[in-house]
């Protein structure tokens, strides 16, 4: 098992500076250990971040007003841990994994020093025993299962147990609470262990048992610009940087609603509370398009908003990814949405300043890039010992000041992610939703997706690259038109420009308020993209730029109407037929 000190070490406060305390201690402590500081008849949770001789520096996760020199500090002997077990789904936690709905029963405001269990101890679960007496199991092996919503939640040998365990006793299948002992075992060294449905794991250590494998399954999110131009594989990593008001949070909310994954973990790290309230109001009433159930049944929310303690921002990010890794070990596909990693980086900068460390660029700590890289490296697809596969896809929103993508957090993120979805203020102001700029965005998964789709859609990769070239050429021609007007542009270039605008308006943009167009299934995307490819490869006959513009505006109107029709309905089929007839009326040849 992960070592836990049985003796309680104590100390006292020597100096306080904001939420950073210098504490003298007698005994043994280690970096990352949880400490509790006594103030006003309550105990405030803290974490050791530096050990120097017989003194430690601890960051307190609460308001430190009232702490005086000589205040008693108790060290717990264990690291900052997440409580893992059935009941995490539909849960709303703060950065220290306190259930906010339980805290709300005691007060409208978060009381200082109040901590509750993350998993309800009274809920009864229908437990099915899988292990038998005499089985030799190791960390991550299944002891039994409980039904959590539509998922079979696997109760596993704790991941903190690094020895093989011989099962000596098991409970029969039945209804039990999470604290019920469901099995007993003996390790090779002779230690007797008891297992319940709950286990703990240090949140800053990677949670992995199994073999990391290459991602080979597309994560369909229902946004054409993402699925086609900037695709992401399950187990991949991507980021969504953008300036204030560009739509980062709206994009993350869309991903949480429509991404083709089993579990979604939402980490609201330092963002406004109103955005979390919006999720809590909407999600119970929204239906998962993949299962038909409420979206909350597959969602876990870590809520550490801008009004909550800054020190807990770091723990909220690590808590979210630990919960996501836990569900990945069950062979499930998990999506972690972190909004925003910039707020986490700002918390790192604040504590680094108080530690008087040598600052890096823009006063961020010199180790910022390695911290961000270590976070994204915890994603990926994993093959378990039983042959099943799970994946953890990470999406991090980045909020660069003034939309400057050259700042340290964005640059450190871009060096480690597999896809970059850059949001543009200009596109957002022009009401082009989603405001992802395909000209600056990229994905390393494009060739992998092309290989996966090659059997279903021959030439998919080449067609996407051709569409990207049309966008680039169209943008260049558009700049020339602004300078010299349409009179100085050839008819061929005007046609390329209008085709690129048509592709942008009718394919890359979607209507978030339309029941059909807000989510576009992959089969529908393939058919619409086939239509766009047909338009790209066709040449048309026009007398003048005005006639060309009129034709493409009519075409745009009909395709927009088509996007709002129910897929494969009678109206949809008629609309598609009308569009192809309109194209034939002006077409002179196909390239």
UniProtKB/Swiss-Prot annotation:
ATP binds at residues 242-249. GO terms for biological process: proton motive force-driven plasma membrane ATP synthesis. The keyword Nucleotide-binding applies. It catalyses: ATP + H2O + 4 H(+)(in) = ADP + phosphate + 5 H(+)(out). CDD domains: ATP-synt_F1_V1_A1_AB_FliI_N, ATP-synt_V_A-type_alpha_C, V_A-ATPase_A. Produces ATP from ADP in the presence of a proton gradient across the membrane. The V-type alpha chain is a catalytic subunit. It holds the Pfam family ATP-synt_ab. It is an enzyme of class 7 (translocase). InterPro entries: ATP-synt_VA_C (IPR055190), ATP-synth_a_Xtn (IPR031686), ATPase_a/bsu_AS (IPR020003), ATPase_F1/V1/A1_a/bsu_N (IPR004100), ATPase_F1/V1/A1_a/bsu_nucl-bd (IPR000194), ATPase_F1/V1_b/a_C (IPR024034), P-loop_NTPase (IPR027417), V-ATPase_asu (IPR022878). This is V-type ATP synthase alpha chain. It comes from Chlamydia muridarum (strain MoPn / Nigg). It comes from the Bacteria. GO terms for molecular function: ATP binding; proton-transporting ATP synthase activity, rotational mechanism; proton-transporting ATPase activity, rotational mechanism. Keywords: ATP synthesis, ATP-binding, Hydrogen ion transport, Ion transport, Nucleotide-binding, Translocase, Transport. Its EC number is 7.1.2.2. HAMAP family: ATP_synth_A_arch. Belongs to the ATPase alpha/beta chains family. PROSITE patterns: ATPASE_ALPHA_BETA.
């Amino acid at each position: 098992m992960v070592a836990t000190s049985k003796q309680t070490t104590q100390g006292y406060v020597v100096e306080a500076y904001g939420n950073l305390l210098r504490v003298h201690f007698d005994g043994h402590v280690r970096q990352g250990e949880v400490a509790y500081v006594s103030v006003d008849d309550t105990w405030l949770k803290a974490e050791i971040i530096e050990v120097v001789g017989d003194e430690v520096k601890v960051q307190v996760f609460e308001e430190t007003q009232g702490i005086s020199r000589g205040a008693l500090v108790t060290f717990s002997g264990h690291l900052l841990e997440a409580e893992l077990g059935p009941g995490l789904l539909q849960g709303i936690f703060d950065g220290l994994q306190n259930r906010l709905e339980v805290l709300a029963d005691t007060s409208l405001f978060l009381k200082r020093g109040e901590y509750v269990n993350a998993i309800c101890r009274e809920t009864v679960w229908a437990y099915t025993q899988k292990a038998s007496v005499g089985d030799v199991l190791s960390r991550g092996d299944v002891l039994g299962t409980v039904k959590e919503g539509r998922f079979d939640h696997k109760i596993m040998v704790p991941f903190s147990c690094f020895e093989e365990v011989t099962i000596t006793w098991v409970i029969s299948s039945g209804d039990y609470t999470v604290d019920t002992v469901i099995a007993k075992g003996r390790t090779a060294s002779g230690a007797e262990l008891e297992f319940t449905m709950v286990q703990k794991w240090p949140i800053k250590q990677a949670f992995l048992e199994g073999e990391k494998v290459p991602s080979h399954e597309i994560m369909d999110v229902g946004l054409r610009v993402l699925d086609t131009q900037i695709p992401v594989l399950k187990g991949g990593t991507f980021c969504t940087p953008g300036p204030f008001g560009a739509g980062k949070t709206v994009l993350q909310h869309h991903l949480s609603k429509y991404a083709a994954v089993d579990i979604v973990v939402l980490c609201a790290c330092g963002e406004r509370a109103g955005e979390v309230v919006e999720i809590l109001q909407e999600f119970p009433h929204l239906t998962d398009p993949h299962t038909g159930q409420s979206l909350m049944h597959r969602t876990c929310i870590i809520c550490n908003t801008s009004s909550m303690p800054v020190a807990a921002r770091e723990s909220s990010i690590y808590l979210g990814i630990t919960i996501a890794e836990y569900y990945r070990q069950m062979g499930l596909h998990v999506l972690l949405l972190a909004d925003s990693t910039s707020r986490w980086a700002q918390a790192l900068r604040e504590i680094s300043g108080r530690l008087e460390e040598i600052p890096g660029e823009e006063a961020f700590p010199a180790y910022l890039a390695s911290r961000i890289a270590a976070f994204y490296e915890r994603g990926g697809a994993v093959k378990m010992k039983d042959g099943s596969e799970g994946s953890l896809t990470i999406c991090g929103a980045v909020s660069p000041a003034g939309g400057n993508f050259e700042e340290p957090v964005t640059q450190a993120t871009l060096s480690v992610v597999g896809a970059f979805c850059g949001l543009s203020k200009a596109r957002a102001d022009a009401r082009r939703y989603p405001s992802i700029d395909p000209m600056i965005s990229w994905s390393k998964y494009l060739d992998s997706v092309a290989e996966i789709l090659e059997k279903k859609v021959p030439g998919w990769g080449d067609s996407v690259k051709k569409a990207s070239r049309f966008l680039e050429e169209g943008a260049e021609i558009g700049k020339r038109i602004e300078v010299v007007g349409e009179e100085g542009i050839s008819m061929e270039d005007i046609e390329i420009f209008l085709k690129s605008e048509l592709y942008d308006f009718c394919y890359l943009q979607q209507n978030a308020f339309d029941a059909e167009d807000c989510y576009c299934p992959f089969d529908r995307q393939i058919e619409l993209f086939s239509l766009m490819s047909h338009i790209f490869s066709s040449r048309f006959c026009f007398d003048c730029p005005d006639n060309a513009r009129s034709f493409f505006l009519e075409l745009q109107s009909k395709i927009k109407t088509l996007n709002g029709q129910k897929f494969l309905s009678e109206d949809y089929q008629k609309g598609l037929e009308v569009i192809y007839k309109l194209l034939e009326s002006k077409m002179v040849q196909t390239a």
